[in-house]
Amino acid sequence: MMKHVIILVILLVISFQAY
């Protein structure tokens, strides 16, 4: 489950940086 959470966090960070 940890890996899934990390992936979600990374995606959110990338989205914020791109935005």
UniProtKB/Swiss-Prot annotation:
Expression induction or repression: The sibA sRNA probably represses expression of ibsA mRNA, either by destabilizing the transcript and/or preventing its translation. Expression of the proteinaceous toxin is controlled by antisense sRNA SibA.
Gene Ontology biological-process entries: programmed cell death
A Pfam short name: Ibs_toxin
Traits of the deletion mutant: None seen.
Keywords annotated in UniProt: Toxin-antitoxin system
Signal peptide location: none
Additional facts recorded: Part of the SIBa repeat region (formerly known as QUAD1a), encoded on the opposite strand from the sibA (formerly known as ryeC) RNA.
Entry's family note: Belongs to the Ibs toxic protein family.
Its job: Toxic component of a type I toxin-antitoxin (TA) system. Overexpression causes cessation of growth.
Protein name: Small toxic protein IbsA
Annotated organism of origin: Escherichia coli (strain K12)
Source species taxonomy: Bacteria, Pseudomonadati, Pseudomonadota, Gammaproteobacteria, Enterobacterales
